[in-house]
């Protein structure tokens, strides 16, 4: 698996925004990725970032209905990335240059 295929997208929720102050970032990652691979992918994708800890959460599929047809959403995996104290911050929102 390529390192740039591991991280899918950042998770933007109220609780994940509250964790930014503590140096924790939440990403949706590939379900086959393990913690060491996630750490390597974050350090490769963002310059000057050093990862201290990786916590992972497997999110099970939810049942959904469209009319009389039932189905399930896809299972996903979330990773909570904790950065070291001397690490640069990850820029999730690029500021517009005026």
From Swiss-Prot:
A GO term for molecular function: rRNA binding
SUPFAM superfamilies hit by this protein: Ribosomal proteins S24e, L23 and L15e (SSF54189)
A GO CC annotation given for this chain: ribosome
Superkingdom of the organism of origin: Bacteria
Biological processes annotated in GO: translation
Keyword annotations: Ribonucleoprotein, Ribosomal protein, RNA-binding, rRNA-binding
InterPro entries reported for this sequence: Nucleotide-bd_a/b_plait_sf, Ribosomal_uL23-like, Ribosomal_uL23/eL15/eS24_sf, Ribosomal_uL23_CS
Alphabetized Gene3D superfamilies for the sequence: 3.30.70.330
Record note on quaternary structure: Part of the 50S ribosomal subunit. Contacts protein L29, and trigger factor when it is bound to the ribosome.
NCBIfam families cross-referenced by the UniProt entry: PRK05738.2-1, PRK05738.2-4
Task of the protein: One of the early assembly proteins it binds 23S rRNA. One of the proteins that surrounds the polypeptide exit tunnel on the outside of the ribosome. Forms the main docking site for trigger factor binding to the ribosome.
Similarity-based family: Belongs to the universal ribosomal protein uL23 family.
Protein name: Large ribosomal subunit protein uL23
Source organism of this protein record: Streptococcus pneumoniae serotype 2 (strain D39 / NCTC 7466)
